[in-house]
């Protein structure tokens, strides 16, 4: 296997500056996986920023990954919405159980965004970013939601989808509250770190084609997405990114309307066809993805290698570059040899120089 010609820091600095690099970058998204490998409890990984950061850094270095540690508390915004995360796992990292703050229509009608002083998730994001800064990591991510997905952290999804059909005005009311949360959070992060150090990321799991039809996506969620991006741009934010979680192949034409700035970062779930995404959204973005999660857990290194090479061949010559990544957050029970297979594919088939 060929060795790297650049360090990860050199590679990513050149990559984001549009300069030539040695090979396709490899980001593992190894968050909870790292906590589990380093034998942290769920409580330690989710809420002890020093332990979480350092666990991720050890694993990033061990697997020769690009990218940096990040705060990963699944459904963390529930804490800011007045709900509860029930933490499980004393000797390992497990997904928390969500207790939504809204149980019924009466709760929804009377729901107000809790006072900002009680936003524990946002406080933890700031704490993590400050710790990362001490370690030499600059840049802070501000969430753009989506608003509809955040409503899914206020109320259980099955209930929400019923309300989409039967109580659309109530859903619109909750989307407005989610927008309020997004924009207030952005103001706090900008004040804390400076607009020049902030970027914007958004995630769309509740808008995928298995949950909402493209028609419903356009009607229910897209107006808020456009409003939020417009208002964030008005605040001076210039760097944007998004993750298409789930199958969004029928939504791609609609996502063009966001008109993300050239060089924006778009990561893709395995259910999105790389060639189709590139054809519809164009070459003006950085793309990342999308090695299947089940393959990383159950597949052989040879299978992961082949899937990685296939993605690299499709996207390697994209104008603004391509990053090989898992389809979503790296599964906790991923085989370490399968991460090595992704690295091997980048080194052997992703060379530029």
Task: Show the residue positions of the predicted features.
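Active-site loop segments of alpha/beta catalytic cores
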Residues: 1-36, 40-45, 55, 66-70, ...
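Ser/Thr/Asn(+Pro)-rich, low-complexity disordered segments
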Residues: 47-49
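Glycine-rich, N-terminal phosphate-binding loop and its surrounding beta-alpha-beta segment
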Residues: 55-87
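A contiguous, low-structure linker/loop signature
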Residues: 74-114
